[in-house]
């Protein structure tokens, strides 16, 4: 058999899941064998992913590759349909890297190690399935499977308020999943044919009411996971109580699932409805940035400050997706990858700091940079990446989003100025709360409660390896963005072009100011959009 025809994606998804099922029969008394087993499986799966994409993925194609489709449960229309394209491929690699490093970061877990590593592998498999599923029911199945391990990881291995945080997480995400199911079934059963194939759903014609309601339903569902204000309140609690490996995956992968689904379903599948909601996304993105930055500055808990920082950074994804430009959409994808790496590194280093100080309250810290200089240096590097220092990946992503929205020809100049200026306020606040974090934790007067006169070990080789594995790609992408953008540029060009195809056209020309001038023209092809926008004026 030709290796290119090998079911690579099925193997990549199945390996962690099958390996997790074998954990109960592995002979191990102290948990040492299980942790090596979990790390080996995660690394092997990540290596298999890299090998498959390196040898057989065509970076110049925007079409789906590694396509597999099997009838799984034909009675309910469920097919095992998986494929990868430029949008999902970089997020798959991010998922593989973050999960592998998170398992390595959990090296000291001694409480129920079999259950812990089993849940980590099941979650890993489900996350991969979300990014490659091409059947709506399969996507929903993977989306739901992923929730259970996250809930258990927080509720069993979390902090003092872990059960409250885990319950809040599952209530938010489970309730949001109902919107996926309802919106998906509305689209699947619309028209003469019933299908759950995502590509086929994107080609169907829908009544305007159904399309708008489905878009709103998907936006709510994926907005919880992204998260979008005001659906974000589960995130600070979850981060505040989750262990360091759990927070790495929460920030590094889970939030990206929401951004990915927003592109795949709302923009690619429902471009006509996106015309109505694009300005809303831009406004919500600005709110995320400003609100997240202001709330981050007010936090005294280290992990909660980073959680609100994540909310702010994901606001740039929304603005990029609303821009209708190639560079804006490309910047949104880059921002997702960049934030995954940066947030994972900061949450891991926060866990390293917590192991030494046994507190997350910044007002009880101070002066630990003197006894932990390596940790201080690594944390500073992560903070610089988070505040989008030039030469770091975050700078490139945010700059592309700013250029995308500023050069967009579908918004009025006044709207673009307001979006850019308010977003810039959030950018200015970011170094304030991050530098304040560094000052409170690593500088200042030494806290007597921490007993810093006693020996506190600095970062260890394992911890240094994990941090370096995250910081090196951050710097590499910052210095040479094409390292990652070449994997999805062709796809983002297609996404932006596909979204723009449904924009009203006057005399064969692309609109110069869609939401201010073009809808007032008498020759519009879309009179209903004209009416809506005029009413909003």
UniProtKB/Swiss-Prot annotation:
GO terms for molecular function: NADH dehydrogenase (ubiquinone) activity; ubiquinone binding. One of its GO terms (biological process) is electron transport coupled proton transport. It is a multi-pass membrane protein. It is an enzyme of class 7 (translocase). InterPro entries: NADH_Q_OxRdtase_chain4, NADH_Q_OxRdtase_chainM/4, NADH_UbQ_OxRdtase, ND/Mrp_TM. The chain crosses the membrane at residues 6-26, 36-56, 87-107, 115-135, 136-156, 169-189, 209-229, 243-263, 277-297, 314-334, 335-355, 387-407, 417-437. Its main location: membrane. It catalyses: a plastoquinone + NADH + (n+1) H(+)(in) = a plastoquinol + NAD(+) + n H(+)(out); a plastoquinone + NADPH + (n+1) H(+)(in) = a plastoquinol + NADP(+) + n H(+)(out). Keywords: Membrane, NAD, NADP, Plastoquinone, Quinone, Thylakoid, Translocase, Transmembrane, Transmembrane helix. One of its GO terms (cellular component) is plasma membrane-derived thylakoid membrane. Signal peptide: none annotated. It is found in: Cellular thylakoid membrane. Its EC number is 7.1.1.-. NDH-1 shuttles electrons from NAD(P)H, via FMN and iron-sulfur (Fe-S) centers, to quinones in the respiratory chain. The immediate electron acceptor for the enzyme in this species is believed to be plastoquinone. Couples the redox reaction to proton translocation (for every two electrons transferred, four hydrogen ions are translocated across the cytoplasmic membrane), and thus conserves the redox energy in a proton gradient. Belongs to the complex I subunit 4 family. This is NAD(P)H-quinone oxidoreductase chain 4 3. It comes from Trichormus variabilis (strain ATCC 29413 / PCC 7937) (Anabaena variabilis).
């Amino acid at each position: 058999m030709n290796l290119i025809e090998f079911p690579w994606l099925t193997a990549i998804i199945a390996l962690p899941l099958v390996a997790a099922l074998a954990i109960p029969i592995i002979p191990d008394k102290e948990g040492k064998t299980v942790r090596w087993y979990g790390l080996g499986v995660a690394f092997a799966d990540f290596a298999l992913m890299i090998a498959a994409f390196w040898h057989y993925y065509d970076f110049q194609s925007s079409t789906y590759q590694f396509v597999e489709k099997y009838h799984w449960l034909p009675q309910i229309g469920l097919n095992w349909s998986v494929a990868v394209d430029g949008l999902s491929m970089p997020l798959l690699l991010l998922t593989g890297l973050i999960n592998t490093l998170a398992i390595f970061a959990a090296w000291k877990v001694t409480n129920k190690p079999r259950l812990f590593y089993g849940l980590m592998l099941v979650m890993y498999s489900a996350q991969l399935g979300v990014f490659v599923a091409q059947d709506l029911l399969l996507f929903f199945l993977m989306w739901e499977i992923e929730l259970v391990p996250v809930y258990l990881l927080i509720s069993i291995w979390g902090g003092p308020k872990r059960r409250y945080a885990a319950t809040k997480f599952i209530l938010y995400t489970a309730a949001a999943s109902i919107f996926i199911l309802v919106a998906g079934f509305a689209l699947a059963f619309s028209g003469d044919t019933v299908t759950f194939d995502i590509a086929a759903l994107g080609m169907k014609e829908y009544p305007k009411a159904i399309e708008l309601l489905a878009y709103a339903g998907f936006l709510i569902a994926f907005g919880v996971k992204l998260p979008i204000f005001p659906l974000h309140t589960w995130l600070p609690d979850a981060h505040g109580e989750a262990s360091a490996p759990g927070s790495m995956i929460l920030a590094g992968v889970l939030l990206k699932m929401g951004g990915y689904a927003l592109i795949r379903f709302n923009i690619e599948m429902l471009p006509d409805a996106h015309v109505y909601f694009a300005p809303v996304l831009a406004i919500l993105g600005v709110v995320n940035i400003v609100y997240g930055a202001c709330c981050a500055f007010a936090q005294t808990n280290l992990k909660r400050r980073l959680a609100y920082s994540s909310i702010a950074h994901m606001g740039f994804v929304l603005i990029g997706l609303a821009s209708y430009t190639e560079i804006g959409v490309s910047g949104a994808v880059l921002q997702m990858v960049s934030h995954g790496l940066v947030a994972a590194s900061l949450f891991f280093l926060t866990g390293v700091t917590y192991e030494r100080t046994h507190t997350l309250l910044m007002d009880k810290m101070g002066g630990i940079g003197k006894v932990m200089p390596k940790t201080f240096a690594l944390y500073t590097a992560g903070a610089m990446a988070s505040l989008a220092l030039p030469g770091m990946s975050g700078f490139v992503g945010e700059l592309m989003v700013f250029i995308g929205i500023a050069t967009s020809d579908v918004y009025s100049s006044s709207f673009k100025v307001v979006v850019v200026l308010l977003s810039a306020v959030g950018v200015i606040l970011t170094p304030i709360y991050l530098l304040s974090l560094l000052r409170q934790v690593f500088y200042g007067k030494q806290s007597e409660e921490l007993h810093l006169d006693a020996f506190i070990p600095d970062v260890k080789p394992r911890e240094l390896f994990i941090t370096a594995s995250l910081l090196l790609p951050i710097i590499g992408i910052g210095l040479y963005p094409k390292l990652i953008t070449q994997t999805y540029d062709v796809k983002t060009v297609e996404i932006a072009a596909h979204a723009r195809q449904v924009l009203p056209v006057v005399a064969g020309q692309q609109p110069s100011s869609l939401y201010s001038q073009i809808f007032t023209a008498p020759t519009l092809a879309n009179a209903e959009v004209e009416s809506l926008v005029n009413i909003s004026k």
